[in-house]
Amino acid sequence: MRNALASFGQIVLAAVVASGVAAVSLIAIARVHWPAFPSSNQLHALTTVGQVGCLTGLLAVGGVWQAGRFRRLAQLGGLVFVSAFTVVTLGMPLGATKLYLFGISVDQQFRTEYLTRLTDSAALQDMTYLGLPPFYPPGWFWIGGRVAALTGTPAWEIFKPWAITSITIAVAITLVLWWQMIRFEYALLVTIATAAVTLVYSSPEPYAAMITVLLPPALVLTWSGLRAAEREADRTLGNKRGWATVVGAGIFLGFAATWYTLLLAYTAFTVVLMTLLLATALCRRAGFRATFDPLRRLAGIVVIAAAIGAITWLPFLARAAHDPVSDTGSAQHYLPADGAELAFPMLQFSLLGMICMLGTLWLIVRTSSSVRASALMISVLAVYLWSLLSILTTLARTTLLSFRLQPTLTVLLVTAGVFGFIETAQSLAKHNRAVLSVASAIGLAGAIAFSQDIPNVLRPDLTIAYTDTDGHGQRGDRRPPGSEKYYWAIDEAVLHITGKPRDQTVVLTADYSFLAYYPYWGFQGLTSHYANPLAQFDLRAAQIQQWSRLTTASELIHALDTLPWPPPTVFVMRHGAGNTYTLRLAKNVYPNQPNVRRYTVDLPAALFADQRFAVQDIGPFVLAIRKPMGNA
């Protein structure tokens, strides 16, 4: 119990240190007038300098630890440098824009909308639809929203610092988890390696990145907890801490349940697979009764995870039990080329491919003799099993989104690769101590080479962060902004005419970034893939299509008043041909790729040519507002 409390205290300390490093660094970066990343190499150059400084600092921290003095200071230094590495890798390239990777486009649009909703109110609500509980896990967005509300920062503007800070916190906690299990110097190596890979492949989705970097130590700890009844000389943790790791595994799964559904499902799948493999081995060795222990531990994990996950999932499940649900599984209706095949990162001819291949070989050699290796091997196999199941489920007209587990697979293999590199160097050093110096030099050079290329890999996402128009109507590259620069005028007009706060107004628009910047409710979401199943996306789309066949304002008002959902009172549209106003909507066409087909709905201008509507042009937009009853 004392060890568990000490570990918890170290995790809290790691979160505090990471938050402090991120806050100070991001504030310092924001105070300088930088050139835009796409048009200048200065930010990339400074990122490289910062990365080299952090990697050198970690090397020095490892030396201090090995010297046997100031070990608490060495741990603190390790937390500072892994945190600083994360911040400089993401924060420096984004230094001249207020937007995060991928700007306010596509997926980031609905994520920003969710953050805006939970900034406006702490209540757990759907991002778009009035009166519905959330379907997508709100954990990351709720905390970010509370930070935004506390600091008085617009949600869209807090997205970048919160994304970077949250990933930094996860990386720091990862270091703490590893140093609980392995030597501190090795914990530094595996943490910085997995952090770098996570930043490359998972950082555009910050809440997924947090779980991805935490998965390897969490799964190793879980495997140790499940196996704690066995008396093996090489197990990572002792038997007395077995139930502490079970509790920790339950907390991690519960955390994943409130954070990201797909990685929750994968982690649960992996833990169940671990339990079944262990129970089978115990049954063969000691009889059927021996299987009770891992099953009992699995039950404990499930109970803890379910209790935590219920905080965010219970409102939706309770509502879904009696309300109609449409487009069930639409979120899984996506099958890109990566989802149609198995990924083998260890076969890439690159630095990353080499470390993944080394990790694969280490797993094969050490699985039978190392708890770490066996845990990682099962986790890797679970990714491939999940991918095969995902391909098979296409027969049922859905998928398991296996392509989104490719960063997870890579991080697991890199984790194994670091352990393989360490053990290979140690084995060779028995014959010549100079091998350790050579290995250190190779490792440092490889780390610098891989890290400094991260901004290049992220360049497309970084470019969009500079070319999208932010909530102030400005672009990070200081070029003429897009039509979003008129959003402030639309917002002012809506507030003036309706006389209602934003969270009491439902808007129908195809320019969904308006809902990302301002906490209005939407009548229809971006696509069915992001829509709450309780919202009946398909029926709403059919209703909008029917309005295009109406001819008078009275018919439209009658149609609005008889809707089974809160009707829109604000319409943000574009001018169409032949005296019409247009909305460009989306339809799910899975299994085709692209999985979304855009179509245009033309609403006759005559529907709004009535004293009960206030209609005006604002930039390229047509704003039609249904006047309150007393003003009509």
Swiss-Prot record:
TM region positions: 10-30, 45-65, 76-96, 162-182, 184-204, 206-226, 242-259, 263-282, 298-318, 344-364, 375-395, 409-429, 434-454
UniProt entry tagged with the keyword Cell inner membrane: no
Subcellular location: Cell membrane
GO molecular function: glycosyltransferase activity
Listed pathway(s): Cell wall biogenesis; cell wall polysaccharide biosynthesis
Ranges of the Extracellular topological domain: 455-632
Major subcellular location class: membrane
Keywords recorded for this protein, A-Z: Cell membrane, Cell wall biogenesis/degradation, Glycosyltransferase, Membrane, Transferase, Transmembrane, Transmembrane helix
Species the sequence originates in: Mycobacterium leprae (strain TN)
Assigned EC number: 2.4.2.46
InterPro entries: ArabinofuranosylTrfase_AftA_C (IPR020959), ArabinofuranosylTrfase_AftA_N (IPR020963)
Protein name (record): Galactan 5-O-arabinofuranosyltransferase
